[in-house]
Amino acid sequence: MAASRGRSKKRSNLELSPDNLPLRSSGRQAKKKAVEIPDEDEDGSSEKKYRKCEKAGCTAAYPVCFASASERCAKNGYTSRWYHLSCGEHFCNECFDHYYRSHKDGYDKYSAWKRVWTSNGKTEPSPKAFMADQQLPYWVQCTKPECGKWRQLTKEIQLTPHMARTYRCGMKPNTITKPDTPDHCSFPEDLRVLEVSNHWWYPMLIQPPLLKDSVAAPLLSAYYPDCVGMSPSCTSTHRATVTAATTTTGSASPGEMEPSKAAPSSLVLGMNRYFQPFYQPNECGKALCVRPDVMELDELYEFPEYSRDPTMYLALRNLILALWYTNCKEALTPQKCIPHIIVRGLVRIRCVQEVERILYFMTRKGLINTGVLTVAAGQHLLPKHYHNKSVLVVGAGPAGLAAARQLHNFGMKVTVLEAKDRIGGRVWDDKSFKGVVVGRGPQIVNGCINNPVALMCEQLGISMRKLGERCDLIQEGGRITDPTVDKRMDFHFNALLDVVSEWRKDKTLLQDVPLGEKIEEIYRAFVKESGIQFSELEGQVLQFHLSNLEYACGSSLHQVSARSWDHNEFFAQFAGDHTLLTPGYSTIIEKLAEGLDIRLKSPVQSIDYTGDEVQVTTTDGMGHSAQKVLVTVPLAILQRGAIQFNPPLSEKKMKAINSLGAGIIEKIALQFPYRFWDSKVQGADFFGHVPPSASQRGLFAVFYDMDSQQSVLMSVITGEAVASLRTMDDKQVLQQCMGILRELFKEQEIPEPTKYFVTRWSTEPWIQMAYSFVKTFGSGEAYDIIAEEIQGTVFFAGEATNRHFPQTVTGAYLSGVREASKIAAF
């Protein structure tokens, strides 16, 4: 960089200082820098000249040229100029000339490298970059447990992951150690190795470490390699050519290729297609994605030393993520990462030291080593200083079990208290249907890309059934609605919501109104102003779409905030396929719970956090104590005040708890002797029921075909229709559902079901809800307030504490992972 710009074939009277500032020099000044010292002869008859490194702060009193490229190499003697790469690595001016001067033998090699670097990279292909990338020797650590010393390899040896895993002191490629070979482990370690660990060593490094053949390379082919911590000289990091247009627009950031050169993501061979941990250039709005060329805020907070130049951090972080998603079924350890850190020079030692810190941070944050991963007895994912904590987890639903699994894997003592006689909370699968698992609670995964549920399915070898988009709307009477009518009313429905979005832009909390009321107001105004009259069928189809919205909200639209009903859409959401978890969520829940200390039938009555330890008392009078407690009970239980806190929860937190609604959704599942719907539905995964009136819009709006080979349908009761269930028994609900099915398939005989169930979540004493929503005059901020810990002692998790992903098992799970990270940090 500075070397190639500051020196040219024609000598100038200007040279560059170590700080790249021009200095006027002369032959006289140069001679003053040459110091005479006695040679090895004691009589002083001969003298030897040497020159110190001109880099301010460099500790190398007698630099040694590592390159030895020129026949006139200075070795450890005198040279007119030393080029500093690190405090222990320099090359002489003679070796610089050997590669940089066009008439020298090494120029062709440097020139060829420069062309490759320029073609693929973004940084300057300077002589120093060339030396760091091509000429520095590799360093490797002895794998003998009793040794562990670092050794410098000779220049011709290329380090590989296999060599890094198996290296022993004195080992050379393709050779067999003879029995009479001396014990090379007894040889002392190079003194420069110790310096690498010092805090001042890394800031003195001239070239940032750029990994060769990184596992992350196939995932980052659309980026300039040197902007994401990889060497542009490796074929594995060569940028991909454009094969498809990007889906979003915008200018490229410093680490990205220009939009016209950008390429779509390419996956590592064998990696699950739902694993996309890195944003591609110009991509945005994808949940649980990181920018490979930028440090996140929490990373900068944890590693401020990389704020000026994040290259090393990005190189190691990106490598760790790629390794994790390549094999998420085993815990990723520093020992598994180290062989893949292929970089020349002493900086490899520093990278190996740093990868442990970075990996532990990413583990604590739940970025890696998460899901249903279990560790062997006595082994833990975090160092010993994390092990001295005890935690009580209240609730064995997805949030509680996610946190308990993480904390247990970290090495902490964890006890889970569950009120019911089973684990899972709102996850409850019915396995009594022949050949089919039907979830009484959730069973659908909305958006699989980077979804932790998809990760856990991969870990367990569970397949997810992709749901198609086709949903025929069937009217009572048996007619299938014309798709053009459905499309037109779907457009009108979304236009109504767009108007709501415009209306709320300048509205305060006190100006909020119910969403249902606002939609009706906008609809009436549109009809009046446009003069358009919708047909009876079009009005019914609109009611179907409103019913779907009530299903999404978990409540009648007259209870939901028009201002904040979709508050989470302002954050990146999970994209990709919508799938049905055919084995049910219970498979995941059971694996999360494996090996944990779970106390069933232990409803918590009070939590006292006035002392040094938290005292938790269950309804049977049993007392439990721990340093921390994590509360993961449903929102409805907090609203009911079923748990007494001492001191009481703050007014701010209680206001937030009560500003959210405890939504109710009920389900019915029916098994039939045969698939009577096949001829009409024709392979679709679900079909819709067009309600004849607004008063009937929440009754069995959608029927899901639970298995293409079996004869099971599942439907939902939503909105104001949920209240009608309270006055009916299960048989009456069944009869009403069968009446609707017979109307939808009027042209054929509908058999009686051989088995069925009707859920009653509203009457479950320790649940009483499906999922949360924002009530009128509420806001999404309430989710964050509920999630706030108290005095670093009492923590909260659950879907109603996850502002980004509420109402989902995914959101509940991630909230548990989030709190486990916070507990570990306190």
Curated annotation (Swiss-Prot):
Pfam families: Amino_oxidase, SWIRM, zf-CW. One of its GO terms (molecular function) is zinc ion binding. Residues 281-379 form the SWIRM domain. Zn(2+) 1 binds at residues 53, 58, 84, 90. Binds 3 Zn(2+) ions per subunit. InterPro entries: Amino_oxidase, FAD/NAD-bd_sf, Flavin_monoamine_oxidase, Homeodomain-like_sf, SWIRM, WH-like_DNA-bd_sf, Znf_CW. It is found in: Nucleus; Chromosome. Keywords: Chromatin regulator, Chromosome, Developmental protein, FAD, Flavoprotein, Metal-binding, Nucleus, Oxidoreductase, Phosphoprotein, Repressor, Transcription, Transcription regulation, Zinc, Zinc-finger. Its EC number is 1.14.99.66. It catalyses: N(6),N(6)-dimethyl-L-lysyl(4)-[histone H3] + 2 A + 2 H2O = L-lysyl(4)-[histone H3] + 2 formaldehyde + 2 AH2; N(6)-methyl-L-lysyl(4)-[histone H3] + A + H2O = L-lysyl(4)-[histone H3] + formaldehyde + AH2. Residues 279-298, 570-572, 802-818 are annotated as: GLYR1-binding. GO terms for biological process: epigenetic programing of female pronucleus; genomic imprinting. Disulfide bonds: none annotated. FAD binds at residues 389-445, 604, 799, 807-809. The keyword Ribosomal protein does not apply. Residues 1-11 have a biased composition (Basic residues). Expressed in growing oocytes and in intestinal gland. Disruption phenotype: No effect on mouse development and oogenesis, but embryos derived from oocytes from Kdm1b-deficient females die before mid-gestation. A zinc finger (CW-type) spans 133-193. Zn(2+) 2 binds at residues 65, 73, 92, 95. Its main location: nucleus. It is an enzyme of class 1 (oxidoreductase). Belongs to the flavin monoamine oxidase family. Histone H3 acetylation of 'Lys-9' decreases the binding of the substrate, while hyperacetylation of 'Lys-9', 'Lys-14' and 'Lys-18', phosphorylation of 'Thr3' or 'Ser-10', and methylation of 'Arg-2' or 'Arg-8' abolishes its binding. Methylation of 'Lys-9' and 'Arg-17' are the only two epigenetic modifications that have no significant effect on catalysis. Histone demethylase that demethylates 'Lys-4' of histone H3, a specific tag for epigenetic transcriptional activation, thereby acting as a corepressor. Required for de novo DNA methylation of a subset of imprinted genes during oogenesis. Acts by oxidizing the substrate by FAD to generate the corresponding imine that is subsequently hydrolyzed. Demethylates both mono- and di-methylated 'Lys-4' of histone H3. This is Lysine-specific histone demethylase 1B.
